[in-house]
Amino acid sequence: MMISTAYQSLFLTALFSAISIAVGNVYQTLNVIGDRNVTIPTNGIPQRLSVYDPYRGVNCQGYQAVNISESQNGVTAYLALLGEPCYAYGTDYPLLFLNVTYEEADRVHISIKDANNTQFQFTSRKDLWDAPLYSPSYNNTNLLYNFSYNANPFEFWVTRKSDGEVLFDTRGQKLVFEDQYIELTTNMVENYNLYGLAETIHGLRLGNNLTRTFWANDEPSPVDQNMYGSHPYYLEQRYKADGINSTLNETTYTSSSHGVLMLTANGMDVLLRQDYLQYRMIGGVIDLFVYSGSTESPKETVKQFVQSIGKPAMHQYWTLGYHSCRWGYTNITEIMDVRQNYIDADIPVETFWSDIDYMEKYRDFTVDPVSYSKSDMQTFFSDLVSNHQHYVPIIDAAIYAANPYNHTDDSYYPYYAGVEKDIFLKNPNGSIYIGAVWPGFTAFPDFTNPDVVDYWKDCLINLTYAFGSNGTVPFSGIWTDMNEPSSFCVGSCGSAMIDLNPAEPLTGISKQYSIPEGFNVSNVTEYSSAYSASLSNYYATATSSVFQIVSPTATPLGLKPDYNIDWPPYAINNEQGNHDIANHIVSPNATTHDGTQRYDIFNMYGYGETKVSYAALTQISPNERPFILSRSTFLGSGVYGAHWLGDNHSLWSNMFFSISGMIVFNMMGIPMVGADVCGFLGDSDEELCSRWMAMGAFSPFYRNHNNIYQISQEPYTWSSVAEASRRAMYIRYSLLPYWYTIMAKASQDGTPALRALFVEFPNDPTLADVDRQFMVGDSLLVTPVLEPNVEYVQGVFPGDNSTVWYDWYNHTEIVRQYNENVTLYAPLEHINVAIRGGSVLPMQQPSLTTYESRQNPFNLLVALDRDGSATGELYLDDGVSIELNATLSVSFTFSDGVLSAVPTGSYEVSQPLANVTILGLTESPSSITLNGQNVSSFQYSNDTEELLITGLQNITSSGAFANSWNLTL
């Protein structure tokens, strides 16, 4: 959720004046960096240099390696500064310490820090971030890489042994290591293919003219700018010509991929340029990890990285259903009506979500006693439980700062308990840091505090009572928002002003007047209906807002000698005005319980909240997998939660960009990811929402979410959207066993569930930047329509002529030529889906909820390759528990006319197998048996080369996979 652009203009002037006053006072006491004077304009803001200014490091000479020691485990050395300090953007350290560790056969860690350990060292703080990467096996007897270096000047490079590829190469580049500026540069191959460096709005392939900034930022969908999360890892894919395919007269290629991680939570720019990539960090040390990757598949490279930061959580089965949400439901009755509308429209819906509307005056862990009364909520929850549906409320990061002089605030437990337990972030002087968010002046939990889990657990338990549930948990997960954490003022603006609370919530939120590109206004009837429905949405108003009483001064900054926190001399390319790193965010000078400044761990606040929420929820509901959807993420967030792509717009471009966003987050180890379907900001329209609802059915996390005052966009609002949704959801719910299997695979070893085409077909360089199509697992290729007013879409179907693709709907082979686009018919209510030959897809007959679908018989869809073979797998468990008493894995193979199923594990599935469909079968069988029993019910189509076998329930009445079986044609 964001503050509207229109309303920002009402208070930004006052806030910028606060910046000027505060920073001006600070810089009068700090005007020297090294031996250079800093120019201070009259407004008090120091003149700083960014990536767009002339580079200051041209005179830096780098370092020389001395006292070098090599061992089986790695290399250590001291690095002595060459020449005079260059003072590029700070004070140069004269002596550094190098520690190269061969941590795994496929991973090397290059650590460079100042010799006196002055700089903050992220890897020394396992209390902040603990990952498998911190527990290496030191299996260095069969290293897959070589680490090489030159001593004077010091430079290093990492190569892959098997093919000699140079993976990271600083030769010819100078290392710069200053107190608030660290620079490391690697040479890049020509026209390199880079993916990752999340989170940003960009196409899949990053290109070589881009600056990626890492600084958590509350801004809705800014293209090529920093956003909510920080994942400073990239995967590079390379291609090599190795011959000619005589049949196709085409060059053939081999490929390789590798990964690079710069482990830091500090602010950073990463410059992608034509022949180099450069890191520019404003603090910390260098902790570089190079992954040797794979010469076979980028999936292996992704797995190396994900397994090092922590394998993703396995979410409950129900999370794969469809989720309905909007900001602006006036009361619980409206949500009840929405639920009934879904039923009437025969559209599946799994979960209903509440935005901040349900809260009392937008205060966390409260419930509006009138609009969301306990009795009404209990009726609502009872209906959900009886229909196997779910509820998820939002929880913002900021806690309302109760006014000690206002007795109506006396009962606000989250604040007073936080004060008593000393939970909140502090100012440098030790007072509580007070910002401003929806409820007024707010404090912010310190999620690194060892006592915060108990505090957060108690707050969540209190929320269950506020819902009238007497301690039972009525919600199935939580939605953590605004957790960069966002703040609507600069600095600790409310430190001396809590007595003005309750400052009423915002009064200036307004409708976002934007409509999708290519909007067709001819269909005014349904548009008017949707708009009218939106008018019933209510937003609380009041006579004053927190922004009208924001203090014109900010708390003085806490500074180390010659160390500037809020205005470092190098300005990373932060999206906020003047690259201000303290704007619209909790200031980097805020400190944790042990005095650590946010400046050094800035990008991991959302990660901390997700981790703490996971721990708290597991204490409340032991052995039940928590579901936490977080806006801000960091390396390893997927271990504990899911992610949505934030406050997008109802634009075709945002629908397109969401494909790359989902693919990249799967590479980052967060497979449960999706966008706000139909868009959050601005009015959607019938065509865009129809296309997006269809595409969303093939995203791991599938939720329609809408902004306050925008027209309604629930799928039943328009007839065509309702029909498109039903069709796409029928496919999704049919494929729930397949979805659960690929999500389990992601949790088990890091294999991405949603994939770019180049990941699945790595030896085709033409796929390197294909981002208008995507793969779901190994077997499904989705080709959505991403522009208005069209009935056709083009897509590529990868693989050589031995590869087969089948149309999902008519089961016929798609006629294609190697490396050429195919034009596909795509009427408004249709999304093109193709099945890859060689696949066995486990399915179940769909119902309106995931629970009901799980009770239905199984089906198998077998799509044969050119050799008449296929393989597949199925994974099932109880869909709920963390510690599992039983699981079931089934391996499917089809070869020489026999379909085999081999189950392992003790989880019992009582549902029978109903049907088997086989595609690409060139002739009809004369007879069919299942474990020797005759099967008489089957049909074969010569036109489609499709065999449909039905009536298997009686033979498999004890369970589809209770035993191994062979289906023989």
From Swiss-Prot:
One of its GO terms (cellular component) is extracellular region. SUPFAM superfamilies: (Trans)glycosidases, Galactose mutarotase-like, Glycosyl hydrolase domain. Changing residue 218 to N: Almost total loss of activity. Changing residue 877 to N: Almost total loss of activity. GO terms for biological process: maltose catabolic process. CDD domains: GH31_MGAM_SI_GAA, GH31_N. Glycans are attached at residues 37, 67, 99, 116, 139, 146, 209, 245, 249, 331, 406, 429, 462, 470, 520, 523, 589, 648, 801, 810, 821, 885, 915, 934, 942, 954, 966. Keywords: Glycoprotein, Glycosidase, Hydrolase, Secreted, Signal. Coiled coil: none annotated. Residues 1-24 form the signal peptide. It catalyses: Hydrolysis of terminal, non-reducing (1->4)-linked alpha-D-glucose residues with release of alpha-D-glucose. The active site is at residues 481, 484, 647. Its main location: secreted. Transmembrane segments: none annotated. GO terms for molecular function: alpha-1,4-glucosidase activity; carbohydrate binding; hydrolase activity, hydrolyzing O-glycosyl compounds. InterPro entries: Gal_mutarotase_sf_dom, Glyco_hydro_31_AS, Glyco_hydro_31_C, Glyco_hydro_31_CS, Glyco_hydro_31_N_dom, Glyco_hydro_31_TIM, Glyco_hydro_b, Glycoside_hydrolase_SF. Belongs to the glycosyl hydrolase 31 family. This is Alpha-glucosidase. The lineage of its organism: Eukaryota, Fungi, Dikarya, Ascomycota, Taphrinomycotina.
